[in-house]
Amino acid sequence: MNNLKYLKLLAKEFPTIEQAANKIISLTSLSVLPKGTEYFLSDLHGQYDSFNRIIKSASGNTRIKIDLEFKDKLSESRKNQLANLIYDPKTIINITKENDEYTETWIRDTIFYLIRIAKRVASKYSRQKVRNQTPFYYRDLIDEMLNIQYESLNKKEYFNQLLDSIIKIEVSENFIITLCELIQDLNIDWLHIVGDIFDRGKRPDIIMDTLIAKKDVDIQYGNHDVTWIGAYLGSYVNACNVVRNAISYNNFQSLEDGYGINLRLLSTLADESYYDDPCERFKVRILDDNKHSETDLLHAARMHKAISIIQFKLENQLFKRNPEFEQLDRLYLERIDFKNGIYKDANGKAHALLDIKFPTVDPDNPLELTPSEQEVVECISKSFRTSHRLKEHMDFLFSYGSVYKIANSNLLFHGCIPMNKDGSFEEFTYQSNTYSGKSLLDFFEGIINSARNMDDNDPDRQTALDFFWYMWCGPKSPMFGKSKISTFENFFITDKDVRKEVSNPYFSLSKIEKYADKIFEEFNMNPETSHIINGHVPVKSINGEKPVSANGKTYVIDGGISEAYQKKTGIAGYTLTFNSHHLAIAKHKNFQVMESVHGAYTPEVTITEEFPKRMLIKDTDEGEEILELIEDLESLIDAYRSGTIQQNSN
């Protein structure tokens, strides 16, 4: 499109010199405001309770803002109560009512305090942005209250009259809730989720609901996310993998309650085929404190084994279908002597199997599903493909997700940029084309986008779906980054060498500054000002590991939000914050501690990089877009003045 055509389109939105000039003034003013605070989280793994607490408290930042605003003018108890109210207004209001404390005095004081906190939080934003973030039904009222200068006696009376009206017409509860939610919203300008929303934890669906409500968010796909996407799009092996992952943690809620996945046929198959099998190797992990009967746990173990065997068959079929995946050495089912219970590894070494009961496996054709297994797979897959709630969440994931993202000089991706030991980028060849570094990530981005839009009868569809399995656990997958995933070996083989998953050299090299710089150059980024931000590998804080390396250029922010990893990390996750003053890492305590100390909770915050001067919007990606629009509007004004384009004042 040439420049004149573009300016004519722009003229439809700004049809006069006055309107274009007004927009330039507005944009110029906006560009010199401080940049908003970005929050980075990774590896949520369905841990909705911890995630929601972190988000609603702005990673403890709300409590800090309350201290800054009120200092010693309010008691610690009152400040804690205010913090709790902001985090969970409905619950705290109900408690206040139960204690007969929901009085006119409490309402007036609370609204006044909340307005002060909201003013502090909103101070870095334009008035228009705050209005846009406010629900329309209270937009004018809250805007008025936020901009009243209390020093004037008349204004104080005016403010008190507004409070009187709120109380008189009995909307105080709804108004307080709205203020609290506005503070929550304004505290986080943008949220980056660096992969792995799904698996392990009970309710990834609740996390997705929170993200959809937030909107100002982006997501980088983790390997646990792409296997769910594959399941949703119709991949049998990914559907089985998702179900197996959930059952392995005795987590039926995420499947049945979250997305309505039908496990009835799987339950029946487990009872019929494994009725006399104790399934010792398939005992499920218990993370909650609820009591579980031995019968329920045994049944879960049998379901776990049943779906695992189906998955192994489908996985081996996939290896055979896709020789370019270079995983033919993973055809482990064909290396089993079922009669004698012996497995031969890729080097020919024999190992006794830890479990020799395979009632659904034909030793002469171990990759073939039985009719009952086929029925189970089709039923489960249909559930994934027809779940309305899953469709809503996957549509959001497609719209806001990507393999990687560059945002304000930060390179975000979940796992790794596959590398060789010498620091060169590892190559992946497919259909005679070779990909590495940035082009490899772009290749997988293309696979995801094309698979989403393929018809069921597309001849390339099966291969596209198989790639979601490769992204889950392929040796050159940037979401995975290991030589293999040893699910089969962990169930059946004792030898730790056979079980070993070798990590890609990236994970050690990225901690060295020169290799981080090499990655920045691959993505056309300035090594002097850029950062790598990823998750995937839990940082064992308990052993002294640090989330920041490469002279402050590489951040790994998987600190164990997922309860399943908290014993390994010793903490309950990291949040990286990027505000106008600095980059900082917040180290979170476990969720039980967060709950027990209520509004007093603040994480341990370490500033990792201070900026020489305050960063303004004009210094960000948004600022570049604003500058471009200002230049375009100036060109439009020139076109109006020269007569090249006619103004339209009608």
Swiss-Prot record:
GO terms for molecular function: fructose 1,6-bisphosphate 1-phosphatase activity. Pathway: Carbohydrate biosynthesis; gluconeogenesis. It comes from the Bacteria. It catalyses: beta-D-fructose 1,6-bisphosphate + H2O = beta-D-fructose 6-phosphate + phosphate. Its cofactor is Mn(2+). Belongs to the FBPase class 3 family. The gene is fbp. Pfam families: FBPase_2. One of its GO terms (biological process) is gluconeogenesis. It is an enzyme of class 3 (hydrolase). This is Fructose-1,6-bisphosphatase class 3. Keywords: Carbohydrate metabolism, Hydrolase, Manganese. InterPro entries: FBPtase_class3, Metallo-depent_PP-like. Disulfide bonds: none annotated. Its EC number is 3.1.3.11.
